[in-house]
Amino acid sequence: MRPLLAVLFLVGRIFSPAYSLVMLVRAYLYRNDIFLKSQRLPVPVISIGNLTLGGTGKTPMVRYVTRLLLDRGVRPAIVSRGYGGKAAGRINIIADRTKTLLPPEMAGDEPFMLAEALPGVPVLTGSQRVRVARHAVEAFGANLIVMDDGFQHLALRRDLDLVLFSARTLLGNGRVFPGGELREPLSALNRAHAFVITGVDSSNRSVAEDFQRRLQGSFPAKPVFSGEYLPAGIWHSSQDKACTLAEAKSMEMFSFAGIANPDSFHQTLRLEGFSVTGSKEFRDHHDYTAQDVAALVAAARASGAQALITTEKDFVKLRPFFGSFPILALTIELRMGQKFDLFLADHLSGHAL
């Protein structure tokens, strides 16, 4: 944990009970339609969210679930809040069924990534996700909505609530914000239909399995799945230069990331056998500048690195600054397994899609 965050949580601990109460009352009001109304769409809604602050692999999971839906002949649309994007409309169409319409600085890095990875799938953002989701149904004929980061967005009813936990952070310190990483008290997990532990690997498998048993003991009626990240390929800043995973691993790299859980990225590089000479971290959703890139190149050269390596999320924002020094991105896919695929198919079988 970063020192500043640790201090914030220590100071904020006294306010955690009050924040917990606010979130409990809010959920109660939505659940009973008192002052706060939860609206249902004419199509199914799958929410992919988390209980904790920070990264739990929601974007790879949205990508994975959406591809499963496409394979089943479903016409999904993705709805997101669009954090980090400058598009300020009530409804922002990041991608229609033909192409990506907004650049990453307008769309937000995660929605842009999803639009690029899932051609033909409408991706929309906006703060009022009920309005945005209705537009996706009416304008694009979507017959299912995938809501990114939707667990706390109770204004939109959902038919399947998937709650993700990172195998590297799990529940953090177990306290509710501002004294810890939890967005809500643990009792909020009663709303979920299933849990997914993401990023399981050899370094955390035993801890993840222990946490899975704890979840199963506390919520015996809710299935718990786990998924692992697998390297899918390498993006290279020079579009005319192909680079395989094997070639990238033979190079000396300087890594950097501006994501919620940068340790996860650096750990993945180490586990996959990349040779890393140094690293740099930026805040989540960081907007890179030419000065940032120049400083990164200088640090990489000073460390003896032959190239910079970063995440997909960061890479898409760096295109205006590509130069002669190579910048690579490690692309990651989430692998779930047949049990999860069957669970999703079974859950959808009751809907006319």
Model regions: which residues?
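A transmembrane-helix-recognition feature enriched in membrane-embedded lipid enzymes
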Residues: 1-44, 351
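Conserved catalytic-core segment of NTP-binding enzymes
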Residues: 138, 150-247, 254, 266, ...
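N-terminal phosphate/diphosphate-binding loop that engages ATP/GTP or pyrophosphate donors
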Residues: 64-124
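Short, flexible loop segments at boundaries between secondary-structure elements
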Residues: 230-232, 282-287, 325-353
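Redox- and metal-dependent alpha/beta enzyme cores, enriched for Fe-S-associated oxidoreductases
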Residues: 235, 239-241, 246-290
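Residue-level signal for inorganic ion chemistry
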Residues: 18, 59, 114, 148, ...
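Phosphate-binding/switch loop-helix module in NTP-utilizing enzymes
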Residues: 117-157
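Glycine-rich phosphate-binding P-loop
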Residues: 48-65
